[in-house]
Amino acid sequence: MGCHPVIVFDNGYKKRVNRPMANNNTTKKTWLKRIAIALGTLLLILSALTSLGLWQMNRFVHTPADQSGKQQIIIIKPGKSLKGISRLLAHKKIITQDILFRLLVRHRKMATKIQAGEYGLSASMTPEQILTILVKGQVMLHHITIPEGLNLEETAKLVERAGFGTRKDFLDLARDPGFAEQLKVRAATLEGYLFPETYFFRKDTPQKKIIQQMVQRFNVVYTPQWKQRTLDLGFSAHEIVTLASIIEKETGNSSERPIIASVFHNRLKRGMRLDSDPTVIYGIPDFNGNITRKDLQTITPYNTYKIKGLPAGPIANPGKFSLGAALFPAKTDFLYFVSKKDTTHKFSKTIQEHNKAVRRYQLGR
């Protein structure tokens, strides 16, 4: 039992007074104060951690993993997850932390926008730059140069060596009349229409698209003015392409193209055979590099020693200058030419002059 204070009055009357209890409000205030301090401390800690996290993220986003890093080929396969992509980049040491990269991607809401493909990435790039490249699909482009004068077979081999599919598939497409019709080429094959130039393609570019781009380039070069010139000369576009392909194969020195073109135009006007060795060679399966008298006597749709006029079609893919020469030949009376074995030719107006040139430059007499 506890003691309680007693009040004694003058008349001797005593009254017991209860001891006052602790103030409830004071207790509540104390607890609230403690909670406030705890929450404040927690908020300060969270704020500090947030600031630290934001600083770390900002530093990660804008800092390359290695300023001296060299470019690496990174292949993002279709359907690859964000986790897989970030781990691949971290494994290749393109980025320092895969988790932070995933946070960056998700924060930017770009997880579904990363495009598959072959990329040239480097640790000298910032994660932000890397993400931009992946989202924009700025994949590596591989170049392939098609020289003037290659035929379909040679072009197909070049495409295969460059890693853009097989030679067979390329030839199947290029020789498909239906595909040629789709491309609005009025010919059975695309021989002559795969324009010689340097092209840039993604590694996974289908051959169909490669061929389409080559034909589109031909259509750009063969301008409306050239089409009108073709009509003025009385030729079809296919005939001009055929003639240009012969000029391309006969030319060793580019300055001679218009003169060589004039020889063929002059012979066509006179009803003479073109007598062009490259046309004979084109018509010989598995030509071994040595043209023989038998070859010259063998009748094929391409042997211009045996047939009059142009061969059955182009024998190669001519470049712009050969097409231009076919449309705008030099004005000459030449009917013959023979190689001087130095990339140039000796041009002649008569068979007598030509035979003399042959003896001098070919027979050494």
Tell where the protein language model's regions lie, with residue ranges:
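N-terminal hydrophobic or amphipathic segments with adjacent small-residue motifs
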Residues: 42-47, 73, 143, 228, ...
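A generic signature of intrinsically disordered, low-complexity regions enriched in glycine/proline
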Residues: 8, 14-17, 62, 275, ...
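N-terminal type II signal-anchor transmembrane helix
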Residues: 23-68
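Bacterial extracytoplasmic/cell-wall-associated proteins, especially those involved in peptidoglycan
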Residues: 81, 145, 158-171, 179-365
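N-terminal Lys/Arg-rich, disordered targeting/topogenic segments
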Residues: 2-32
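Signal peptide-directed extracytoplasmic domains
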Residues: 53-222
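Hydrophobic alpha-helical segments
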Residues: 33, 45-48, 83, 153, ...
